[in-house]
Amino acid sequence: MGAGRAAGLRRHTLGAVSPTPLPDPELLPRLRADLAAAAYTVDGVQQVLGPVAAGALHREQRLPADLATRHRSDRAAVLVRLFALGFPVAWDDADRALPTLRADGAVQLGLARAEGADLRATCDLRPYADETHEWWVASDLSEIATGHPLAETHVLGIGNASTTLAEWTIRRPVRRALDLGVGSAVQSLHLAAHAERIVGTDVSQRALAYARFNAALNDLTLELVAGSLLDPVAGQRFDLVVSNPPFVITPRSGGVPRYEYRDAGLVGDGVVEALVRRVGEHLEPGGVAQFLGNWEIRRGADWRERWREWLAGTGLDAWVIQRDVQDPAEYAELWARDGGVRSGATSFDQMYLSLIHI
């Protein structure tokens, strides 16, 4: 369930990082109505782009989508160019695409800024769906929209890890659910269908701001608390805990960017270990915790030994699926590219060197 779709070593910034959008209670219903009326939905975007351009956009290549929309003025195409591709659109076209909110309203919400006679998005806003629900998710602009590596405070939108977790999560009705590392609230959108109360936590104030906006945009009640891992919910128990935590194994050497969405600041696979050892204290009897993670496999060891060590004394029953194994070079390449640093750049080689020597 929840088959969601969406279409250097120095500190990376895009100049001043754009402010997060505001959950204005007067303007959000207008935005919601305009997006729906424009068919700015997963299926609507697919129809605008066609399968080739939509597939390329999913692989973070925007040229085919640019070609498919460049000379179109229909509402859905204008919104794709504005919010998914990051191109400026004419102010008048934006007014026609958002007839209730208008371009001025998009600026007031913090979704866009004026750029001469054009409107340019300051965040990514895309449709998202599962088998029975449709939503919209705002997040920071991706590197394909900005042309720059990600800022360390970057807040992710809809990604493969998020949709994988959503597909695997047990969807039985629960009283209390915890979305640990809430990010842009993708998991909370799914939880709203079967949880009476949802608590979302994140160490990033920027992520919490996006979660607050997305909850309001999608008419979702969500309790948000700031803090690291399970610290903000000390003494609380839940029927279901879900988490796509910042699990990337990152070198703790100086100068390596610390992307908040993927790096918890712990050594090695410490974030996964901490969750395994502590999450049982926060589960109701019969409760379930489901999360993704990366872990180290020591040379010559069975990968299950590490999990047996972590689980010892927790009282938990565990089902651990090792989906993939990567050697150090493969792992370094994956996560050096993930921040938007391109192969061949000096910063890529430096990042690669740091990761491969973890």
Name what the model sees in each region.
Residues I356-I358:
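Conserved small/polar residues in nucleotide/adenosyl-binding loops
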Residues S243-A274:
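Mobile active-site "lid"/loop adjacent to the S-adenosyl-L-methionine
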Residues E115-A177, S184-H194:
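SAM-dependent Rossmann-like transferase core, predominantly class I methyltransferases
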Residues S18-S139, E143-A145:
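N-terminal auxiliary segments of SAM/dcSAM-dependent transferases
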Residues G159-S243, E296:
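Conserved SAM/SAH cofactor-binding pocket of Class I
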Residues G268-I321:
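Conserved Class I SAM-dependent methyltransferase catalytic core
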Residues A329-A345:
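Short, surface-exposed amphipathic charged segments that create phosphate/polyanion-binding patches used
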Residues M1-R11:
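Compositionally biased, low-complexity flexible segments
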